[in-house]
């Protein structure tokens, strides 16, 4: 009976010791934080544009410089890629290191730039002339040539009309002149036969040709003659 009591006490003591050890170990154990990006763990740190940077593996220092880092495959160690003046330069350095380490599985920052750089230049496709297009071109060229010929002919006709009037136009003009009313129709046939000497005597002995030379003298002489006759 004494042996059973001693064994029971020893078992209870062992259980208590194990419980105490578990409590002490739970107090000393620390919970590991979940793996997050560096920017999430360092929220509030870094440069003013660090949180707005969209590039992977790129962060900004407090003094404004940009740094690039990348993790090695199957390892947690980070490789330092350098310090850069702009986030774009740091992203390019990260992309080049990612291609070297991960190959086709690399997650790149500049996908569009890599796609445009790797795409071959588009070759110029030669235009194939179809029968319809050939006929259209020939019709257009023939119509243009015909219009030019018509324009040239019209210009030549205009020149001939202005420089060399036709005989029919002359006949029409003569017919028009003969149909005009004459002086005899108005009883003025005597005025056409008045000689120049009669006109000179009527003017006081002054010729009508002197009127164009000194009209003032002619007017004075005419006034004197009129006064004497009155």
UniProtKB/Swiss-Prot annotation:
Region (Disordered): 1-31, 122-149
Stated induction or repression of this protein's expression: Not induced by high-salt and drought stresses.
One MF term in the entry's GO annotations: transcription cis-regulatory region binding
Biological process terms in GO annotation: positive regulation of DNA-templated transcription; response to stress
CDD domains: AP2 (cd00018)
Gene Ontology cellular-component annotations: nucleus
UniProt keyword terms in alphabetical order: Activator, DNA-binding, Nucleus, Stress response, Transcription, Transcription regulation
Pfam families per the UniProt record, alphabetical: AP2
Annotated localization: Nucleus
Transmembrane segment boundaries: none
Segments of the chain annotated as binding DNA: 54-111
PROSITE patterns: AP2_ERF (PS51032)
Main location: nucleus
Cited InterPro entries: AP2/ERF_dom, AP2/ERF_dom_sf, DNA-bd_dom_sf
UniProt record similarity statement: Belongs to the AP2/ERF transcription factor family. ERF subfamily.
Function: Probable transcriptional activator that binds to the DNA sequence 5'-[AG]CCGAC-3' of the cis-acting dehydration-responsive element (DRE).
Name assigned to this protein: Dehydration-responsive element-binding protein 2C
Organism per entry: Oryza sativa subsp. japonica
Lineage: Eukaryota, Viridiplantae, Streptophyta, Embryophyta, Tracheophyta
Name of encoding gene: DREB2C
């Amino acid at each position: 009976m004494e042996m059973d009591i001693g064994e029971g006490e020893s078992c209870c003591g062992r259980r208590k010791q194990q419980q105490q050890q578990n409590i002490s170990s739970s107090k000393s154990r620390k919970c590991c934080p979940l793996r997050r990006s560096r920017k999430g763990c360092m929220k509030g740190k870094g440069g003013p544009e660090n949180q707005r940077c969209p590039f992977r593996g790129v962060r900004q220092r407090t003094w404004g410089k940009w740094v690039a880092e990348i993790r090695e495959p199957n390892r947690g160690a980070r490789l330092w890629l350098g310090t850069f003046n702009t986030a774009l330069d740091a992203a390019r350095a990260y992309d080049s290191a990612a291609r070297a380490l991960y190959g086709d599985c690399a997650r790149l920052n500049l996908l569009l730039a890599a796609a445009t750089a790797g795409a071959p230049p588009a070759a110029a496709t030669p235009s194939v002339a179809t029968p319809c297009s050939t006929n259209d071109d020939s019709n257009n060229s023939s119509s243009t040539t015909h219009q030019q010929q018509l324009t040239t002919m019209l210009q030549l006709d205009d020149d001939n009309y202005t420089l060399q009037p036709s005989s029919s136009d002359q006949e029409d003009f003569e017919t028009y002149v003969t149909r005009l009313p004459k002086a005899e129709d108005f009883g003025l046939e005597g005025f056409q036969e008045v000689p120049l000497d009669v006109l000179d005597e009527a003017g006081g002995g002054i010729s009508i040709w002197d009127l164009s030379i000194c009209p003032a003298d002619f007017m004075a002489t005419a006034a004197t003659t009129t006064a004497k006759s009155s």
